[in-house]
Curated annotation (Swiss-Prot):
This is Photosystem II assembly lipoprotein Ycf48. A lipid is attached at C24 (N-palmitoyl cysteine). Keywords: Lipoprotein, Membrane, Palmitate, Photosynthesis, Photosystem II, Signal, Thylakoid. Its main location: membrane. Belongs to the Ycf48 family. SUPFAM superfamilies: Oligoxyloglucan reducing end-specific cellobiohydrolase. A lipid is attached at C24 (S-diacylglycerol cysteine). A factor required for optimal assembly of photosystem II (PSII), acting in the early stages of PSII assembly. Also plays a role in replacement of photodamaged D1 (psbA). Assists YidC in synthesis of chlorophyll-binding proteins. The keyword Protease does not apply. GO terms for cellular component: photosystem II; plasma membrane-derived thylakoid membrane; thylakoid lumen. Residues 1-23 form the signal peptide. It is found in: Cellular thylakoid membrane.
Length: 338
């Protein structure tokens, strides 16, 4: 009798486990023999946070500890540059964006810089002390026109190269603060609240954020747009989801869990072939060539002592071929060579 009573809780646990697994899609991961990525390691141990190119050869990479580097050979090699900033100020340079020779660079705390000559000279702009939150995302819209988004969900636009800024959002509280924020070329935004308990959207012609419930009890890690404009979501527990109806942002696919290694995915990106890449902690970099049904893992990426925090594929008119980078911590990045 005691044996029967002891085994009954185990039976319940097994049934519960089967139920949980049936609600997920666990694809398994194969190891690829070759990789389209080239490893680049900087002597500086700072974390790379963003990269952008002006043309096929000239580009800039920015990161923590005031890191700014320039490439003149398409990203094969990089040289460290210095900004005219007080030595006692330690900025996290988090975003950089160019359109032609004009570019914008933002950092934390409260840094916005502007260039008109492809990064040869940078001018620091004053934001005053009334800006809600810290700069998070900068987009070069047109000549002298840029949009600045902050960690508070506020969005400002300048039409005079940063001399003045006008608010585009009447009430930023609907975003719940920001832990992740993305923008489409059309000017639509999506953000994850600071606690990851919901996400919000902002259409280009709207001045208010709309909050949406997350897809499950798991907190949202990051969210973004695929090339067609649909949303994807990365949640705690290494879960990947895709929105199945752009008119219904509560309608999400079952969670896809390619690897159960205890590390979360931090970003996703689509390469020129339409393959989906996901990167995360402990050197995790995986790819799906069939829209998320199956996934492959790359050994070169897994061998590096880093977390992959951002995946960037640059597709702009100034570039003959799309460029790709995976940005990691501790001075590691990967460059797309396919």
């Amino acid at each position: 009798m005691k044996k029967i009573i002891t085994s009954f809780p185990n039976l319940l646990l097994s049934i519960l486990l089967c139920f949980v697994l049936s609600s997920c899609s666990s694809t398994g991961v194969k190891m690829s023999d070759s990789s389209p990525w080239k490893t680049i390691q900087f002597q500086d141990q700072a974390n790379a946070l963003d990269v952008d190119f002006i043309d096929n050869n000239n580009g800039f990479l920015v990161g923590s500890n005031r890191l700014i580097m320039e490439s003149n050979d398409g990203g094969e090699t990089w040289e460290k540059r210095n900004l005219d900033l007080p030595s006692e100020e330690n900025f996290r340079l988090i975003d950089i964006d160019f359109k032609g020779q004009e570019g914008w660079l933002i950092g934390q705390p409260s840094l916005v810089m502007h260039t008109l000559d492809a990064g040869k000279n940078w001018t620091r702009l004053s934001l005053g002390n009334k800006l809600p939150g810290q700069p998070y995302l900068i987009t070069t819209v047109d000549d002298g026109v840029a949009e600045l988004a902050t960690t508070a969900g506020a969005i400002y636009q300048t039409s005079d190269s940063g001399e003045s800024w006008n608010a585009k959002v009447l009430d930023a509280s609907g975003s719940g603060g920001v832990r992740d924020l993305r923008r489409t070329d059309k000017g639509d935004y999506v953000s994850v609240s600071s606690l990851g308990n919901f996400f919000s959207t902002l259409e280009n012609d709207s001045n208010s954020w709309i909050a949406h419930q997350r897809a499950s009890s798991k907190r949202v890690q990051s969210i973004g747009f695929n090339p067609e404009g649909s949303l994807w979501m990365l949640s705690r527990g290494a879960e990947i989801r895709f929105n199945e109806d752009t008119n219904d942002l509560e309608n999400w696919s079952k969670p896809i869990i390619p690897i159960l290694n205890g590390y979360n995915y931090l970003d996703m990106g689509w390469d020129p072939n339409g393959d989906i890449w996901a990167g995360g902690g402990n050197g995790t970099l995986i790819v799906s060539k069939d829209q998320g049904k199956t996934w492959n893992k790359y050994p070169i990426a897994a061998e590096l002592p880093t977390n992959y925090i951002k995946i960037v594929f640059l597709d702009k008119e100034a570039l003959d071929n799309q460029k790709g980078f995976v940005l990691g911590e501790r001075g590691y990045i990967l460059k797309w060579n396919s």
